[in-house]
Amino acid sequence: MKFEMQNVYDYIDQHADEYVEFLRTLVRQPSIADTGEGIQEMVQLVKQSLQGIGARPQEIETPGNPVIYAELKGECNKTFGFYDHYDVQPVDPLNEWVTPPYSADVRDGAIYGRGVADNKNGLASKICAVDAFRKVYGKLPVNVKFIVEGEEEIGSPNLEVFAKAHPELLACDGYNWEGGVKEPGEPAQVHFGAKGLLYVELECQGPRRIRIRAMPPSLQTPPGAWCGR
């Protein structure tokens, strides 16, 4: 069967308001990995969303927050995987928010809320893309897997535990990692790596008095000077 992508794009355009509202629903649900706030409610919301596109999601327990796994069969024996996460960072400091962090407020054509950019937009876009493809053609061109974890924002401490316990679930011919970059009119960019996390606590000691006027005590250096170097 020949799949014309323009038909899928047209369907997405016709249902754009519906898909945007779905993203706003995800953003309205707190899911802070560090504190556990809203995690179980978010897990259920993601599972319901995957059920809505024809999948049978599994909630796989880990020592921390669960991993959600789902699979949909396609037309051939090739399998493509989507890695995403449903957790977000804390919302502090609250006084810097123009609108409440879970309001998913729309201003000037953009949605504002915790997690709208990292990574609930990525999760929503993939679910909506699969939904649109199935609505247009009734099937998918390849098998699709969803691996959605809930601890990415704290360094994915239990993703390796999941991977070692369920290697067969991770078997795919290719993967899409949570987000991506695509400039208008250009093909999607392929990245070969990503930065990790580094936390440093630095203590330093300098002279009590200026000994060379051209070199004042290092402790007088503004804290920002340590950043971005």
Spans of model-derived segments:
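Short small-residue beta-strand/loop micro-motif enriched in glycine and branched aliphatics
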Residues: I111-G113, R208-A214
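Acidic-enriched catalytic cores of C-N bond-cleaving enzymes acting on peptides and small amides
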Residues: P167, K182-E183, F192, I212-R229
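Flexible glycine/proline-rich, aromatic-decorated loop/lid segments
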Residues: Q189-Q205
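Fold-independent oxyanion-binding glycine-rich loops
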Residues: D84-Y86, D108, G150-E151, E178-G180, ...
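Acidic/histidine-rich catalytic neighborhood of metal-dependent amide-processing enzymes
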Residues: A117-G193
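A structural signal for well-ordered alpha-helical segments within the folded catalytic domains
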Residues: D17, Q44, A124, G224-G228
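Acidic/His- and Gly-rich active-site-bordering loop/insert found
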Residues: K2-V116, K135-V142
